[in-house]
């Protein structure tokens, strides 16, 4: 199916750091099966750094990077709301990507100050290599700014 599946995580940060914090995320790999098949990063494996609207994988036979992809979005107002209304990036598996930031103390519950949602979308085409064990480990790091 070429329809995206979406899963989200709620991030909560409580800090008394006067200049706030930044939360980054990094995947240890792209989604990889036990057969070493992969679901590449958004968009068609190009690792989009600039947020853009979700696009389905193109599914070009013989071009494995186009068989499926996954990307991330954040509802935080980070960098002037760079993720806008569900814009996605794919550059979070080879380096860390900032997904949440606030410039002052945070209470762990107020939207865009102490709490936000990060979501991951994944879609595959009929050419994606079969497997039910595609995995990647996401590591979040919250860094205070003093």
Briefly describe each language-model feature range.
Residues 1-146:
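Signature of Gram-negative chaperone-usher
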